Design a protein with these regions (language model features):
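Terminal intrinsically disordered/low-complexity segments used for targeting and assembly
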Residues: 2-89, 139-140, 262-307, 487-498
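Periplasmic alpha-helical coiled-coil/stalk elements that build and connect Gram-negative outer-membrane
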Residues: 24-27, 186, 190-307, 419, ...
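A glycine-/polar-enriched beta->alpha junction
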Residues: 88-98, 105-121, 150, 157-175, ...
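Heptad-repeat amphipathic alpha-helical coiled-coil interaction surface used
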Residues: 104-106, 111-113, 174-176, 181, ...
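A short glycine-centered flexible hinge/capping loop motif at secondary-structure junctions
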Residues: 234-238, 448-452, 489
Length: 498
């Protein structure tokens, strides 16, 4: 008796635990303890994210195959890369191009679905079975007997279904998928151009930072030369401690300028790694670009805008979206019109009979049928009007989007067109400024060394030269950035320098 009670208690506890667990499992998941506290990420979710990033976070495009071999997109730390080489690496490694390519591929594959509906569907099936029928039979001379009939059959069936005519509903669906595939393809092109644009800007920033570093190094050497001259003058009794202090200040300012230029180089390196799709700490050597300044376009602004509008990915995608919406409206209208279809079937086989376990005999069976049907929707409860209004609304929305995109694109092109001209003019002015500042710096430093000038003049002249060289480096960068921007907004950006 005690054993039975103990067993009952254990079973009761187990049942209670199961019920409690079931109730807990059905409780809603709260976002956090309250509106005043943020939601805390569970450790399990952190582990899942880390595992996913380790697996997919830094995988170059060339590493997707089973036989990877050497990675053609690998970086060589001893090689100095040119602009074109970096763009080629970015197009291979940047995950944005891989994602856009897969999306374009998915859109292209989606066109196969409506294409398949234009063709007949062929299906094969097999039906088999066994049946026993027992029937009592009254004999003429009295008494009854049971007649047992066994029937078994295996019948293969071939069926063909073909929608012959639907007033263009399937064709409209095919047009929709074709236009959406066009959208995905031009978005893939836009992703490539965005990568090229990002690499161009990062390369220009790295080049400008390198020139600023070189200018800061020259300014630092000049400051040390001035400090040495001040100390020599003091030793000869013709200088003062004030001059030495001013020279030390100039030296510190030159060192600060060098540190700032090195910081700009580090920032440019991070941006370049982001554009390439490489880890942010990767060291990439840049080839000192000796390429000349980009030239301003000889075309007028109106010509540039007219040429660009027909090839910009966002406008091409907007027009394709509009065409898809128009095809969708035609498909909605056709969906409520009659449909004509054909159904044909062919089956053959043998029915095998036996009575009371006697001799089995077969009866051949063959059936052939062809049916043509017409379906006509009569009443949909307002569904047709609702779907048509929704389709027309999508057309109006797409038309407005095209107009908005066109206006924004024209404004972007005009701004980039003028920015390039201004940047080129600024560079030429900065180049003249550097030449003048260089002459003034050399003269002031020589005058101070021979005692006919002051240290203040020499320091100011050296500072003016450094500022002029930094301004020229920025102006050169701005000119290349403006050229890349104009090429980008006109959909003409390629791997070649703009």
């Amino acid at each position: 008796m005690h054993a039975e009670r103990g067993l009952g208690s254990v079973l009761g506890l187990l049942l209670g635990a199961l019920l409690q667990g079931g109730c807990d499992a059905t409780l809603p998941v709260e976002p956090s303890a309250g509106p005043h506290q943020p939601w805390v990420l569970p450790e399990s979710l952190r582990a899942q994210v880390k595992s996913t990033l380790d697996r997919y976070g830094d995988q170059p495009a060339a590493a997707r195959g089973a036989d990877q071999g050497s990675d053609p997109a690998a970086l060589d730390p001893t090689h100095a890369y040119s602009r074109g080489e970096l763009i080629d690496l970015a197009q291979r490694r940047n995950p944005a191009t891989r994602a856009a390519w897969e999306q374009a591929r998915q859109a292209a594959l989606a066109t196969g679905v409506p294409r398949a509906t234009l063709l007949p569907r062929l299906a094969a099936s097999v039906v088999g079975g066994y049946q026993r029928l027992s029937t009592p039979v009254t004999l003429p001379f009295g008494g009854t007997r049971t007649l047992t009939t066994d029937v078994q059959a295996v019948i293969p069936i071939l069926t063909v279904e073909w929608l012959l005519f639907d007033f263009g509903e399937r064709t409209s669906a095919l047009e929709v998928t074709d236009h959406l595939a066009t959208v995905a393809r031009v978005q893939f092109n836009q992703a490539h151009q965005q990568v090229v644009f990002d690499v161009n800007r990062a390369f220009n920033a790295g080049g400008a930072a390198g020139r600023k570093e070189a200018a800061a190094g020259r300014a630092l050497a000049a400051a040390r030369q001035v400090l040495a001259a001040a100390e020599t003058r003091a030793q000869r009794g013709v200088g003062t401690r004030i001059e030495i202090a001013q020279a030390n200040t100039q030296l510190a300012q030159a060192q600060l300028s060098l540190v700032q230029a090195q910081g700009e180089s580090a920032t440019a390196r991070v941006a370049l790694n982001a554009a390439l799709g490489t880890p942010h700490g990767t060291l990439i050597r840049l080839r000192d670009s000796a390429e000349g300044l980009p030239a301003a376009t000889a075309e007028g602004l109106d010509q540039v805008i007219a040429r660009a509008l027909v090839q910009r990915p966002d406008i091409v995608a907007g027009v394709a979206q509009l065409q898809a919406a128009q095809a969708g409206e035609r498909g909605v209208a056709a969906a409520f019109r009659p449909k004509v279809g054909l159904i044909a079937s062919l089956s053959t086989g043998d029915n095998q009979f036996s009575f009371n376990g006697g001799t089995t005999f077969a009866v051949p069976l063959q059936q052939t049928g062809v049916l043509i049907g017409v379906t006509l929707p009569l009443y949909e409860g307002g569904l047709r009007d609702s779907r048509l209004q929704s389709a027309r609304s999508r057309i109006l929305s797409a038309q407005a989007a095209v107009a908005t995109t066109r206006g924004a694109a024209a404004a972007e092109i005009a701004a980039a067109y003028e920015a390039l001209r201004s940047a080129l003019a600024a560079y030429h002015a900065a180049d003249v400024l550097v030449a003048a500042a260089g002459v003034g710096s050399a003269a002031a430093r020589t005058g101070f060394e021979v005692g006919v000038g002051t240290l203040t003049d020499a320091a100011a002249a050296d500072k003016a030269l450094l500022d002029a060289e930094n301004a020229r480096a920025d102006a050169r960068r701005n000119a290349f950035d403006a050229a890349a921007t104009l090429a980008f907004v006109t959909a003409g950006l390629t791997a070649e320098p703009p």
